[in-house]
């Protein structure tokens, strides 16, 4: 089904109870329901947002269009967790219900500040001429998970510097100062990251510090979802450069999710990642995008990704549902590369162990399992997973020890 702009931007209150019931019934018929991953009950899930720790709980939000597997009028769903494995949904909490976000509550981030969880997100406004104006908006979540929006934008767009592609604010604290990164397209149609600081850490008063300097390469035509985190004493920038030239880094997705590791983050006369290394793919898989990462109160760094891509269709679409989030990944640096590991609590999901030898030609009929592979002799090994009966369709993974 092709969705028109009018259908995508219907207001939420225009849907009846019967509409919602029909959506749920169809989604329940999907054979693609996951066992471990966060997914929507109906409609579209895309970017993870507001990943944070507050009031003794892990908090996570995701962008949501409840009414179909398309990018329509976005809102945020809120979840909380005690262990980063089991998440409990509190509900849809951030609606596109003001003049500043009447065309969608887009991506953003969160920071525990004083006695609340502070949210900053992009609100898309469209008028009768359908011209987009992106505002960076604020909200607070209290200890009872009640959300209240700020009435006025925190950061206004400056169209002398950027186009209307100006979104995905990431708020973070560094050396006692609160900063914000925003992905953008420059007025020259290049991908850039804008840097702001909260004046005297007042979260309603922001100063534009200019662009973040982290590479001499051209970063495509737009940067989405920038995140700056601190891992093992290094500064790590995770971001999504749309239109990146593949001569810079090879990638197979429509849009890549990249990272760079630097020695330090500095501001002042120059806003830069000092001695930033090469761009590296965050994930070599087919569907990993819009990764959101943050530093927990103890300094540990965690990340979670959308397992999906814009402008892509999936088998679940026929059931009016699309998108899941990755499992939470704990981050570390080894040999100047970013390593991503499942959190320790994932081990508690393990059940019966089964040892398989290639010589036995074992067949696993379940699609829910953890696979550990031990190969001692070969320099290269090819695994075929989820192979069909004919053997002509599979997920093939090549492990090359020599080239790592």
PLM features: residue spans?
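Beta-rich carbohydrate-recognition and catalytic domains
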Residues: 1-103, 107, 111-168, 173-219, ...
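Structural secondary-structure packing elements that flank or coincide with functional cores
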Residues: 296-297
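Secretory/extracellular carbohydrate-interaction modules
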Residues: 347-404
């Amino acid at each position: 089904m092709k969705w028109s702009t009018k259908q995508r931007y219907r207001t939420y209150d225009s849907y009846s109870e019967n509409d919602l019931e029909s959506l749920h019934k169809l989604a329940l018929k999907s054979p693609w329901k996951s066992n471990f991953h966060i997914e929507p009950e109906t409609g579209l899930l895309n970017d993870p947002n507001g990943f944070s720790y507050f009031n003794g709980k892990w908090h996570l939000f995701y962008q949501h269009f409840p009414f179909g597997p398309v990018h329509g009028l976005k809102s945020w769903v809120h979840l909380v967790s005690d262990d980063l494995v089991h998440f409990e949904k509190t509900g849809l909490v951030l609606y596109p219900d003001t003049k500043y976000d009447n065309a969608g509550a887009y991506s953003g981030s969160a920071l525990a500040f004083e006695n609340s969880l502070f949210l900053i997100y992009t609100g898309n406004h469209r008028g009768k001429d359908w011209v987009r104006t992106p505002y960076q908006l604020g909200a607070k979540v209290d200890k009872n998970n009640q959300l209240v929006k700020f009435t006025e934008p925190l950061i206004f767009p400056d169209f002398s510097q950027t186009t209307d592609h100006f979104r995905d604010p990431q708020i973070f604290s560094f050396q006692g100062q609160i900063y914000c990164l925003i992905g953008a397209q420059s007025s020259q149609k290049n991908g850039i990251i804008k840097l702001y600081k909260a004046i005297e850490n007042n979260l309603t008063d922001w100063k534009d510090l200019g662009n973040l300097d982290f590479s001499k390469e051209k970063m495509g035509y737009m940067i989405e979802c920038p995140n700056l985190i601190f891992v093992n004493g290094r500064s790590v920038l995770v971001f999504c450069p749309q239109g990146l030239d593949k001569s810079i880094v090879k990638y197979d997705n429509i849009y890549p999710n990249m990272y760079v590791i630097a020695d330090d983050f500095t501001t002042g006369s120059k806003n830069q990642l000092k001695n930033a290394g090469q761009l590296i793919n965050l994930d070599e898989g087919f569907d990993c995008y819009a990764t959101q990462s943050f530093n927990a109160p103890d300094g540990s760094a965690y990340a979670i990704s959308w397992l999906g891509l814009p402008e892509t269709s999936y088998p679940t679409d026929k059931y009016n549902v699309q998108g899941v989030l990755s499992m939470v990944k704990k981050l570390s640096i080894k040999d100047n590369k970013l390593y991503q590991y499942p959190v320790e609590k994932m081990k508690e999901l393990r059940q019966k162990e089964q040892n398989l030898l290639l010589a036995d030609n074992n067949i696993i009929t379940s699609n829910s399992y953890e696979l550990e592979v031990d190969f001692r002799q070969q320099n290269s090994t090819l695994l075929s997973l989820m192979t069909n009966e004919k053997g002509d369709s599979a997920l093939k993974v090549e492990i090359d020890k020599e080239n790592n």
